[in-house]
C-alpha cells in the first residue's frame, strides 16, 4: 500500500514538472535584435527558476549505506601501496661466454619483476625499410619515399610521362602497360 502511494506521488511530481516546462516555450523570432536578445535572456532566467523549483519538488533520495557501490569504495580506500625495493646497483658479470647467458637468466630471475628491463615493442628496428614491430620488408609503392632499392632517386614527373627511371614494384600489379 505504501509503495503504491509513493509511486502515485512520484507520478504527480513528474506531471507538475512537465507542466512547468511546457509553460516556458522558446520565444518566437519577430522583432529587433534587442527584443529577441531580451526574450532569450528572460527565457533563460525563467528556465533557471523552473529547474530550481523542480529540484525542490523532486529530490533524489540518498542511496542506502549498505549499497554495493559504497562497499566497493570502502574496499578501495582500505588498499595501501607497498614499499618498492631499491633497484640493484650492479649486476654480476661472468667472464665466460657460455655462462654469460645463464648468469643473466639467473640475475633476472632473482630481481623483482619491476626492475627487469623490458624493451618497448614499438622501438624502431635497426634495419632500413623494415616496419616497426615487424620482420617483413616494406615494399615501397609508387609515390613512396622517392628512391629505389639501390638508393637512386626517382622523378615522379618522368614516371608520369612514360620514361621510367625506377624499376616496377614487385607484387603490386603495376607494370609499364598499366601506366
Curated annotation (Swiss-Prot):
Residues 16-24 are annotated as: Homomultimerization. GO terms for biological process: mRNA transport. A motif (Nuclear localization signal and RNA-binding (RRE)) lies at residues 35-49. The keyword Transport applies. It is found in: Host nucleus, Host nucleolus; Host cytoplasm. Residues 34-44 have a biased composition (Basic residues). GO terms for molecular function: DNA-binding transcription factor activity; RNA binding. It comes from the Viruses. Residues 24-44, 82-102, 141-179 are annotated as: Disordered. GO terms for cellular component: host cell cytoplasm; host cell nucleolus. A motif (Nuclear export signal and binding to XPO1) lies at residues 71-82. Keywords: AIDS, Host cytoplasm, Host nucleus, mRNA transport, RNA-binding, Transport. The RNA-binding motif binds to the RRE, a stem-and-loop structure present in incompletely spliced viral pre-mRNAs. This region also contains the NLS which mediates nuclear localization. These overlapping functions prevent Rev bound to RRE from undesirable return to the nucleus. When Rev binds the RRE, the NLS becomes masked while the NES remains accessible. Escorts unspliced or incompletely spliced viral pre-mRNAs (late transcripts) out of the nucleus of infected cells. These pre-mRNAs carry a recognition sequence called Rev responsive element (RRE) located in the env gene, that is not present in fully spliced viral mRNAs (early transcripts). This function is essential since most viral proteins are translated from unspliced or partially spliced pre-mRNAs which cannot exit the nucleus by the pathway used by fully processed cellular mRNAs. This is Protein Rev. It comes from Human immunodeficiency virus type 2 subtype A (isolate KR). The lineage of its organism: Viruses, Riboviria, Pararnavirae, Artverviricota, Revtraviricetes. The gene is rev.
Amino acid at each position: 500500500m505504501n509503495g503504491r502511494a509513493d509511486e502515485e506521488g512520484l507520478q504527480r511530481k513528474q506531471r507538475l514538472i512537465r507542466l512547468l516546462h511546457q509553460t516556458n516555450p522558446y520565444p518566437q523570432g519577430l522583432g529587433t535584435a534587442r527584443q529577441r536578445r531580451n526574450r532569450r535572456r528572460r527565457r533563460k532566467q525563467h528556465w533557471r527558476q523552473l529547474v530550481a523549483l523542480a529540484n525542490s519538488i523532486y529530490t533524489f533520495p540518498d542511496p542506502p549505506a549498505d549499497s554495493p557501490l559504497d562497499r566497493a569504495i570502502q574496499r578501495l580506500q582500505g588498499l595501501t601501496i607497498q614499499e618498492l625495493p631499491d633497484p640493484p646497483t650492479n649486476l654480476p658479470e661472468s667472464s665466460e661466454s657460455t655462462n654469460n647467458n645463464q648468469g643473466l637468466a639467473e640475475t633476472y630471475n632473482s630481481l623483482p619483476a619491476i626492475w627487469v628491463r623490458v624493451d618497448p615493442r614499438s622501438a624502431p628496428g635497426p634495419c632500413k625499410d623494415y616496419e616497426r614491430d615487424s620482420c617483413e620488408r616494406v615494399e615501397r609503392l609508387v609515390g613512396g619515399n622517392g628512391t629505389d632499392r639501390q638508393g637512386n632517386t626517382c622523378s615522379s614527373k618522368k614516371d608520369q610521362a612514360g620514361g621510367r627511371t625506377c624499376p616496377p614494384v614487385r607484387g603490386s600489379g603495376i607494370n609499364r602497360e598499366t601506366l
